[in-house]
Amino acid sequence: MTVPATRKDLMIVNMGPHHPSMHGVLRLIVTLDGEDVIDCEPVLGYLHRGMEKIAENRTIIQYLPYVTRWDYLATMFTEAITVNAPEQLGNIQVPKRASYIRAIMLELSRIASHLLWLGPFMADIGAQTPFFYIFRERELIYDLFEAATGMRMMHNYFRIGGVAADLPHGWIDKCLDFCDYFLTGIAEYQKLITRNPIFLERVEGVGIIGGEEAINWGLSGPMLRASGIQWDLRKVDHYGCYDEFDWEVQWQKEGDSLARYLVRISEMTESVKIIQQALEGIPGGPYENLEVRRFDRARDSEWNDFEYRFISKKPSPTFELSKQELYVRVEAPKGELGIFLIGDQSVFPWRWKIRPPGFINLQILPQLVKRMKLADIMTILGSIDIIMGEVDR
């Protein structure tokens, strides 16, 4: 009987760009020696839409609907960074009530993003049940968004100097009810997932990143905090009204996929604490800085008259961006989301550079998966939490 010769050469496999574990149109060219990963090369750009160039031909108000297409699971954060930049350039004050409403919406968006990370991440490593559970809570958040903004996703809710509309009657009570219910949901996830021996086998000690290594790679968000670095821009930059709430930065020191899971689960609990405090202490007053409507380029134009502004039509304000450079950032669910803005005395930005957290965090993937098993690629990629809309822009 002839025994077939065993081949020793390496095998090159394409994962994606339409693989169910890729979380978007990401392609990985993986070099395998049996089950062992020798090399991994991510191929990006399938979802590139020229978002930075589009910004250079739009006013800020015109550009707002575009930004929700970067990270389409946490759209409030892309809107927040878009209005924060001209607010800082023009030294525009945001009313206290608007600041509280923004914080509530941002933290609800953070929870929704973490939930839609948790479900597919668990499905990737073989646990199907949580995938259906997370949609139950996520639907409740989207119902709250729809009641306040009119849209479940792509809200277009933030405005320069405030928000588009005040919270509707009964919304605060409905949101407080959700917070009480969601805390029991998190406890349910902890029982179902955290101590599950099969889950621990798949994630414990997989994809370890040291603290110094995380800093050198420029990682941010849960990726950085899971490696022992207590860095959260809400505490570091003191933006918005976060200093008025009692909450803690969540971090772990192991740096593996389990640590990243624990950080995100704990962050959802902290977000609920922030939302509850904001809802109970929300002040009265305007939800928008109405003086912003006077910041039009043609200050003495007839279009600024009371009849045109408040009785007839409400044209979009065109803000003249002063000739200076500015970098602003927020703590998005996936990490540091930043905008580098250059103005040149025009209503259009001269340069609009996006610093997406997913793109920076994805850089470390090839190093993490080398010398690991093929099945660990799903675990590691899922624990990074990427959205290709913001990676490719």
Curated annotation (Swiss-Prot):
Signal sequence interval, chain numbering: none
Name of the gene encoding the protein in the UniProt record: ndhH
GO molecular function terms noted in the UniProt entry: NAD binding; oxidoreductase activity, acting on NAD(P)H, quinone or similar compound as acceptor; quinone binding
Protein name as catalogued: NAD(P)H-quinone oxidoreductase subunit H, chloroplastic
Family (UniProt): Belongs to the complex I 49 kDa subunit family.
Organism: Platanus occidentalis (Sycamore)
Reaction equation(s) it catalyzes: a plastoquinone + NADH + (n+1) H(+)(in) = a plastoquinol + NAD(+) + n H(+)(out); a plastoquinone + NADPH + (n+1) H(+)(in) = a plastoquinol + NADP(+) + n H(+)(out)
Presence of keyword Translocase: yes
Subcellular location as annotated: Plastid, Chloroplast thylakoid membrane
Subunit-level organization: NDH is composed of at least 16 different subunits, 5 of which are encoded in the nucleus.
Record EC number: 7.1.1.-
Pfam family, one: Complex1_49kDa
Function, as annotated: NDH shuttles electrons from NAD(P)H:plastoquinone, via FMN and iron-sulfur (Fe-S) centers, to quinones in the photosynthetic chain and possibly in a chloroplast respiratory chain. The immediate electron acceptor for the enzyme in this species is believed to be plastoquinone. Couples the redox reaction to proton translocation, and thus conserves the redox energy in a proton gradient.
Highest rank taxon of the organism: Eukaryota
GO biological process, one term: photosynthesis, light reaction
